[in-house]
């Protein structure tokens, strides 16, 4: 070895400076054999010997490898053999050369950054003969064996070559012998990883993000560009797998799909019995009860669903057409729910109620909401009701009781009946209570619900609903989150909210502050024309979410929707952000609504009518209740009834509208008269005052302009008010003239009192009447009730009750339809001794009395000129005249005779056989039986036929006594004459209780033997029954007339007979 060492040429410093690391670059190539500069300095003989010594050892250790591996191993073995021989001098020279090379390598590393890694590898190759003492100082390999041993086996051959070249330089020979064969102990990658981490830690975050974007973003974008495919090519075709609809149990669709997924995991493709379906899904909603399976064949679907519960593959499957597949697989974007948003409840006790989102679970399926509770605190519980198992009750079958109103939770109310179900719970903020298994915080119900049980679209919360959710602050004021409310409303704003011409304002975005008027709307984009600023006259587009309607104080607007004040008209009094406060034209109250629910209105007032009903109308709700209309809505009326209660009724629930009576009068507490239009004040209570609008029995409906509640209408009792001022300056004191009977007498002082008024039951009630004028002219009905001037008539044709004045009614016979005279009471006579007046058989027919000549109507007797009609003597003022003219209408003694005697104008006249009903011969004073058979009807006897009514001959018939003429044939029959039928037979009606009587102390109706209607046997000269018999005037009558010359009716000769 000494000879070889001496003969070796170490070169000069210039050659060291010209170190060329080119062979190191070729070491990465597998086909090129690496060359070492240090090995080139050894002669070929020595190199051949080294190779010969190492080959058997490598054959035993690693087996056959490629040529590059063998050369590298041989060099390492040669270096180890030299160290074993103990050639210290050669090691010293090599050590010096290595140190020089390392210094040169460090300089090269600083100058050439691109070749840093290759130079480092060459230096390690040259320094393979480093002394063990120095290698010990560098540390062992135990820190790197566990992490690198299993990694390098998977590297390529070039990396293995580099590691083996470094192995001898980095490892001590003793450590090298302890390693297993093929172990890799390189720590270069660890040091490289450490350097990379230090570089990233010192790198700026923005620069690091830029590097990541360049590294990954470019690749992703390139991949996207390469996969652009027209959508029409993605549509399914007949070559794609088919989709089959399979029936399943409703509500179990998701469970069936999960069961299919589990079965696919148990029997994956490639197993003994794989599941050959491609996919399975369900749609729910309207398509519940079916699952959809994608497969090539129907047999694959049946095999996959065999023996699976809740699904029925044996039933008829539905093959989805190819053109319907895209609709079946189209996925709609779910509504994003955020805390603070507004939703509505779909079902249950809180159906339709507004709720605020408190929290949304990470899965997006469960939501915690805040509700205004509906609790009755056990007030509607029925302790005697049967116990019902809640679990067995069908869903949606709630209790039949009314739904409690919305109000905040009250622990005081809950303690009254359900104290055992109430408990306080600890919370982070506010009062928290647990009641009947529910949690209440600050009076609100906190409830967990599924998203499918909520309405998330078109919620349209009203301002009055949101006001209930206002949170109270420490200073007592309520805080309302209008921002979240406005955001919810913006999401549900439809196109019809903005119409052309609406003034709008942009309140967010780049165009904030622009004011204009809308020209068109397309989806969520509104086109508007700018009216103010530098862009005036230009057309711009803005999203609906950035717009709000713009109003000024004093504008007259109309509420168009989204609020319970819909169709209200009013004037804007305040504008604040999205809310507008206006003064209603109808109720004169301030209401607050959103600007999106308003629109400029050209109307200056409010119609206030719903059909035939208007504000302040008096209506009849039922038989005993009336009310005054205080507000008219679109479909209902708000009324204030006589008891002071406010009701909401439909027009169909109102019986009728009461027409106000201008002459209605009542008395106040002091007895003074009060009428419509008077101003009164309440004496006790709230001491309200107002103008009388309606008077109904003992109730007054007042109108107070200073009161906004109920449109200024109040109801009071007449006994609780006093008059403040009368309409037109009328005296408010009691009417004294009506309180003095002497001043109420009519006629000349000293004259007799007029006929008394009728009291008690009105004779008109129950009569059949006909209306002779007015809107109901010609209609017939029955009088059900009446007052002094009006009557309540039930019309036959309309089957309804109407109020009609009495003066337009005519009493009709319900059978014949003839008009009846109700002005005369007639009829009943007063028996002898029953009255202070002189007894008379005809006393019942006197009008009004028989004592004084001047008061008789018609008057008679003497020569008084006050008789109407006058008679006696040769006076020509009789109306109508009588004696020889035949047109006399009444007789001074029995004035109901109609036309007889004298002239040919007698009605009816008779002579010979035409006489009706009896007697013959004008001027005959005796009884005339006349043998003619023309009497109608005559009755038995030699000369008589069917007299009507029958009569009887009497010895006194021919006497001049007026009473004796009572047996001549009056109408109806006279005394002892036969009624119809037959004489002396049973009358119709009988004689036991006639009304009125035929003679003194009796009054048959009509009587047997003496049954006039009315009439009697008395010969009292002043009696004048209508009609009468005996001495009275019949129609045609019988008896003595005039001055007694005549014993019966006179008949002129020559009267034709029938």
From Swiss-Prot:
Domain of life according to the entry: Eukaryota
Intrachain S-S bonds: none
Keyword Transcription regulation found: no
Biased composition (Low complexity): 975-998, 1023-1038
CDD domains in UniProt: KOW_Spt5_1, KOW_Spt5_2, KOW_Spt5_3, KOW_Spt5_4, KOW_Spt5_5, NGN_Euk
GO CC annotations on file: DSIF complex
InterPro entries membership: KOW, KOW_Spt5_1, KOW_Spt5_2, KOW_Spt5_3, KOW_Spt5_4, KOW_Spt5_5, NGN-domain, NGN-like_dom
Cited SUPFAM superfamilies: Translation proteins SH3-like domain (SSF50104)
Family classification: Belongs to the SPT5 family.
Protein name, entry field: Transcription elongation factor spt5
Organism: Aspergillus fumigatus (strain ATCC MYA-4609 / CBS 101355 / FGSC A1100 / Af293) (Neosartorya fumigata)
Lineage: Eukaryota, Fungi, Dikarya, Ascomycota, Pezizomycotina
